[in-house]
Amino acid sequence: MQSCTAPNTPKEAKQEPFCRDLDDIKAAGKLRALTDGSSTSYFIYKGNPIGFEYALLKRFTKELGVNLDMIMVENLDSIEVMLDRGEGDIIAANYNITDLRKSKLDFTQPIFTSDQVIVQAIPIGWDTLSQTQREQWLIDSISDLYGRTVTVRQGSSFHEELLKLKNQGIPISIELSDESTEDLIKQVADGQIELTVADENVAKLNMTYYPNLIASISIAEDLPIAWAMRAQAPALLDSANRWLSKFKSTRAFAAIQLKYFKARSQHRLKVLSSYSSLGGDQISPYDDLFKHEAKRIGWDWMLLAAMVRKESNFNPSVESIAGAKGLMQLLPSTGAHFGADSLSDPAQNIRAGVAFIEAVMERWEADSLDTLNLIKFTLASYNAGVAHIKDAQALAVAYGANGNDWEEVSPYLLKLSIPKYYNHEVVKYGYCKGIQAYQYVNRVMDYWGHYRTGYK
């Protein structure tokens, strides 16, 4: 195991390894996962983050007691460099364990194993071909690869396996690309390239999107797929291994595998949906309204979308027990005050909701909050009311905390349900169930982070 040492002096050329292990992750309250935007790992569907890797990581981070930050890597050639630089803590991207990768990274126990298969497309006029012609076209053995061109991602485990075949004397033409595996599979389906290689689970899933594809021979069998991390994170590795050992034997793990790798027709509809970050470019049917109204308050429209996802799950007809209605869950009195005649009308509801947000933001102008803190204080105020958040701020200041930093104020919001604190002389509005507003802010910020990652 490599050790973590002090940074190099300017005279030293070698870069010391980045160090961030389990204790650092728990102290920061966040695990940063490097992943790819793919149908197997991670994507957004109808405003919700989903994917096999995401589902596992979400449960693992819950076990650790930390939040999850998904970092989507556009070019997987750089994923190991990003890990090495400390831009993430773990690689979770349907990542094969190979001898070359093991020399640089630590891997967990295998999550599952998969063959690597050749992906090819059925040619137009297949039904008119004779049996002999079909047999000549189909790749049924390694020898059928002689003289064929196979395109794979540069630096991938597929490239390593093809090189092994080439070193065995099989004259394969290998074309390297910086495209993702799923992009290359699509290119095979579209006739842009002849062949590619994919993990069998990924190939079979993509075959539901492109019916003209088949997975032919395996060029490598039962290759393990796992999470990868820096050698300088032994405690994280041990924790992940212990968790995987237990979780892989549960019904929950079997259900996740079924959802993403076996119930392919259902998964296909999600991936190809216009409300998928893979198949389309929409978060919800109301994106145009979000884009228009968010400009009034200087917000990223995806932040407004994240807020509506939390408020109503994009359901314009929903009504709470307290009588709050529509996309932004406004009380009729609030809606009327901000000009909404019908809260079931999405345009009116969003317009009134944004006007309400603007009024809340004005209440915080005198505090000179930075942009991110203004967003968080505004979200909390929208949920719990400005008065209770002002109480939490005053309480934080009374105990020596920074009243303009949400991370320092939020613990005192949680204390407003305790008599010792809500009876404090600086607290004007008494009891508040602060956990609701605290979780509200975290959830909206979490959705916003996913939307910014998944949609470019």
Identify what each model region corresponds to:
Residues 4-103, 173-178, 183-186, 240:
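Extracytoplasmic small-molecule ligand-binding "clamshell" domains
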Residues 317-341, 348-359, 444:
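Substrate-binding/active-site groove segments that recognize
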Residues 8-16, 22-23, 54-63, 120-157, ...:
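Extended ligand-binding regions for polar small-molecule ligands
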Residues 378-451:
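Catalytic and substrate-binding regions of cell-wall glycan-acting enzymes that process beta-1,4-linked
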Residues 37, 110-127, 200, 204-242, ...:
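Periplasmic-binding protein-like
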Residues 77, 81, 93-104, 163-165, ...:
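A ligand-binding cleft/hinge motif common to bilobed small-molecule-binding domains
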Residues 264-313, 347, 364-368, 456:
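Export/targeting segments at the very N-terminus of extracytoplasmic proteins
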Residues 32-41, 46-62, 113, 117-179, ...:
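Bilobed "Venus flytrap"/periplasmic-binding protein-like clamshell domains
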